[in-house]
C-alpha cells in the first residue's frame, strides 16, 4: 500500500494580514565629536543551529496537530476547511515579526487558499535566494467507504497535520532568529495538494521569471512508523542533488538520528507532493515523508492513510516527527544564514 500524500517578491501573494512590519535596526555607528571614541555595537551572535533545533517544542507540535484534526475535515470541498484557514491565520498572526500573505486559486471551481508566513532578516531581504519550507494543510479520506468530500470526515492527523504543525512551530522559533538570517524564509501552507498539488502548482505559475526561490523543502506525513525512525528523501532532477546531499549531511552534522534516510529520485509529477512542481521546474527541491512506496522491512504501511481513521491517536512515532521537524529546519537555516 502506498503511504504518501497525494503548482517576487512573488507576484504578491495577496496580502491577507500583516503582523508587525519587519524592523530595520538603527545604524550602530553614529556621528560624534572628534574627541569622542565611537564603538560600534557588535552584531548579535547567531544562536548555533543545534541550539535552535532544541527550541522546537514537541508539546506545541502535538497541540497544533490535534487542533487541525479536530475540524473534522480540511478537504477544500468541505465547509470545515474554512476553520483550518482561520486557525492558521490566527496562530501566525499572534507571532510578532511574522508577515502573513495569501495566494488564491481555483481548480474545477473549487477555491483554494495558500497561506504564507514570511520570516525576514532585520534588513530588507534580497529579491532572490529565498528558502521555502512547505506543507499542505488540506486533507482527504478517499480510501474510506462511501466517501463524499463535502461531508465525510478527513481528520488528516498524520497526513498532513504533522507537517502543518511543524510549520506553525517553525514560525514561532524562527521569529526569534531573524537577526541571524541573510535570506527570507517562506513558510508555505499549501492547499489542494490532495487534488494533485493544485495549490502549489498554481502558486508556482504565478511567480516571476526569475523566480525568487533558491530551494524548496517539503515536510509531509511524518508521524507514523512503529518499526524505525525512517524517512524517504524525495529529490527532483539533478538540479536538486546538492540540496539532497545537504539534507543528508545535516542529519549527520546535528546528530538528528533519522535512520534510515533513503533518497528517492522522482522523475515525474506522479509523486504527489508539493515539492514536485517546483523540482520539476528546475528549482532545487526535496521532500521528506515517512514512506513513499510500498511497505518494506522498515515501514509496515499506514492503514489510516487517506481514511476517516487518520486521527491523532494514529500519530504514534513522536520521535520520528520531531526528527523530521529538526532535519527540515536545520537544512533551511543553513541555506538562509
Give names to the regions the model predicted.
Residues 111, 151-239, 246:
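Acidic/histidine-rich catalytic neighborhood of metal-dependent amide-processing enzymes
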Residues 2-4:
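C-terminal motif of bacterial Sec signal peptides marking the signal peptidase cleavage site
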Residues 26-79, 128, 297:
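N-terminal hydrophobic or amphipathic helices/low-complexity stretches enriched
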Residues 47-55, 69-80, 101-106, 148-160, ...:
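Second-shell loop/turn segments in exported
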Residues 63-122, 261:
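A non-catalytic alpha/beta surface segment that caps or lines the substrate-entry region
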Residues 60-69, 101-102, 116-118, 130-134, ...:
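Structural recognition of the beta-strand scaffold that forms the well-ordered cores
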Residues 226-337:
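Active-site-adjacent substrate-binding region
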Residues 6-9:
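Bacterial signal peptide processing site
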Amino acid at each position: 500500500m502506498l503511504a504518501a500524500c497525494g503548482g517576487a517578491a512573488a507576484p504578491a501573494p495577496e496580502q491577507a494580514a500583516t503582523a508587525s512590519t519587519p524592523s530595520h535596526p538603527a545604524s550602530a555607528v553614529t556621528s560624534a565629536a572628534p574627541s569622542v571614541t565611537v564603538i560600534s555595537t557588535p552584531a548579535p551572535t547567531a544562536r548555533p543551529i543545534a541550539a535552535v533545533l532544541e527550541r522546537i517544542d514537541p508539546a506545541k507540535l502535538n497541540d497544533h496537530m490535534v487542533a487541525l484534526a479536530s475540524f473534522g475535515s480540511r478537504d477544500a470541498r468541505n465547509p470545515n476547511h474554512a476553520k483550518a484557514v482561520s486557525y492558521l491565520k490566527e496562530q501566525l498572526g499572534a507571532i510578532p515579526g511574522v508577515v502573513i500573505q495569501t495566494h488564491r486559486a481555483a481548480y474545477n471551481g473549487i477555491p483554494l487558499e495558500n497561506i504564507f508566513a514570511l520570516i525576514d532578516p532585520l534588513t530588507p531581504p534580497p529579491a532572490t535566494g529565498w528558502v521555502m519550507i512547505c506543507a499542505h494543510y488540506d486533507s482527504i479520506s478517499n480510501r474510506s467507504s462511501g466517501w463524499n468530500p463535502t461531508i465525510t470526515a478527513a481528520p488528516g492527523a498524520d497526513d498532513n497535520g504533522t507537517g502543518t504543525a511543524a510549520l506553525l512551530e517553525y514560525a514561532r522559533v524562527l521569529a526569534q532568529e531573524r537577526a541571524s538570517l541573510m535570506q527570507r524564509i517562506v513558510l508555505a501552507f499549501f492547499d489542494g495538494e490532495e487534488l494533485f498539488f493544485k495549490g502549489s502548482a498554481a502558486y508556482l505559475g504565478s511567480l516571476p521569471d526569475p523566480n525568487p526561490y533558491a530551494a524548496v523543502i517539503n515536510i509531509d506525513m511524518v508521524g507514523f512508523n512503529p518499526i524505525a525512525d525512517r524517512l524517504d528523501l524525495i529529490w527532483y532532477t539533478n538540479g536538486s542533488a546538492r540540496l539532497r546531499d545537504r539534507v543528508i549531511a545535516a542529519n549527520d552534522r546535528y546528530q538528528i538520528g533519522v535512520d534510515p534516510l533513503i533518497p528517492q529520485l522522482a522523475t515525474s509529477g506522479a509523486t504527489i507532493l508539493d515539492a514536485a512542481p517546483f523540482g520539476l521546474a528546475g528549482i532545487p527541491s526535496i521532500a521528506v515523508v515517512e514512506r513513499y512506496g510500498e511497505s518494506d522491512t522498515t515501514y509496515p504501511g499506514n492503514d489510516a492513510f487517506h481514511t476517516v481513521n487518520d486521527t491523532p491517536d494514529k500519530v504514534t512515532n513522536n520521535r520520528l516527527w520531531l526528527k523530521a521537524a529538526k532535519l527540515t529546519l536545520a537544512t533551511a537555516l543553513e541555506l538562509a544564514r
